Swiss-Prot record:
Residues at the catalytic site: 254
Presence of keyword Magnesium: yes
Role description: Tubulin is the major constituent of microtubules, a cylinder consisting of laterally associated linear protofilaments composed of alpha- and beta-tubulin heterodimers. Microtubules grow by the addition of GTP-tubulin dimers to the microtubule end, where a stabilizing cap forms. Below the cap, tubulin dimers are in GDP-bound state, owing to GTPase activity of alpha-tubulin.
Protein name: Tubulin alpha-2 chain
Residues annotated as signal peptide: none
Binding site for Mg(2+): 71
Primary location: cytoplasm
Amino acid sequence: MREIISIHIGQAGIQVGNSCWELYCLEHGIQPDGLMPSDTSLGVARDAFNTFFSETGAGKHVPRALFVDLEPTVIDEVKTGPYRQLFHPEQLISYKEDAANNFARGHYTVGREIVDPCLDRIRKLADNCTGLQGFLVFNAVGGGTGSGLGSLLLERLSVDYGRKSKLGFTIYPSPQISTAVVEPYNSVLSTHSLIEHTDVVVLLDNEAIYDICKRSLDIERPTYTNLNRLISQVISSLTTSLRFDGAINVDITEFQTNLVPYPRIHFMLSSYAPIISVEKAYHEQHSVPEITNSVFESSSVMAKCDPRHGKYMACCLMYRGDVVPKDVNAAVHSIKTKRTVQFVDWCPTGFKCGINYQPPTVVPGGDLAKVQRAVCMISNNTAVAEVFSRIDRKFDLMYAKRAFVHWYVGEGMEEGEFSEAREDLAALEKDYEEVGAEVEEDDEEEY
């Protein structure tokens, strides 16, 4: 088996995790207590869903997941929520003090206290696997736990499980909406270790997803639940081929191989289609070309940057539902002929496609309509540098005055770490600039 362990860190990671596991359970017909009426081969871990769920002798299906936070309230919600019986109590780790939006508390002082119990639990989860494939890590980099403890765990995973893939689903601060003044500090410090210790990171951003909810689903005032359900559809689409047997399956390592041209350039944009409310769905038919076109529109990207400002290096299209390869090939061909979607000159093919016949599942009472087919795109586009430059600018304004820095230094950090992380991010922006710019130099030689 090629198992995957999911690690949910901090409030954002845990709440996205709740939505994901709720959706996985619905997709596989697993009840909130972990029982699965349709599973006839109990105790035999041969089914595709066993990549994400382990089975006990009593027929319970337990997520291969760890939830960790430095304060108890969010984990307590899981412990009292509808899926409380799904998880093993030892998979839900909380501590008594908060990281207080401070990267240094999450990474040095408070995080250190909890990192060993987390790694012990991860080791138990890993021992329970026959062929561990990798980790999915969910966190946000604006707060203290997601950024600080998230980085610490990633660093330790690199040491203990160096050869395993690590995919991050990371929520970055939004341009307009802010939940903490020190977000730019936490994000820059955290990105420093994401560059080093993850293989692929999918960038998400609340503001972009708010806009999608308002525009496509007609939700006046979206809540985090609305956002997380949308995020969970993306993550579910990416992991479908790991959890179901499909026509063209895509392995986790295949994402890496196909999307990452250079090790540092592994920050991806994601988009999903069709995002459509129940009222509208009755009147529209979504063909493969239509949904394929819509994932390339800037309005469907789940991070605040415009892919038209950049060039694509590669993209992964994951179709699910009533889709045949012939339609996909035609849709991809028409995208390639469009002038709006620009690829870098050194990557002419640029498309990786996966198809899974399992149609998309929706949460009962949720916002999305049930559709016959859907597509999720993960793309490597140079425009993602816009996200970094925006955070850098805010970082520089604060750091020039050394504002709030004493809170970090007081928790055992050194000021040098700020400038080191900032320089690393500047280098990353430069890298993106260079991979996109290789075109112009060649053109000059031709004329």
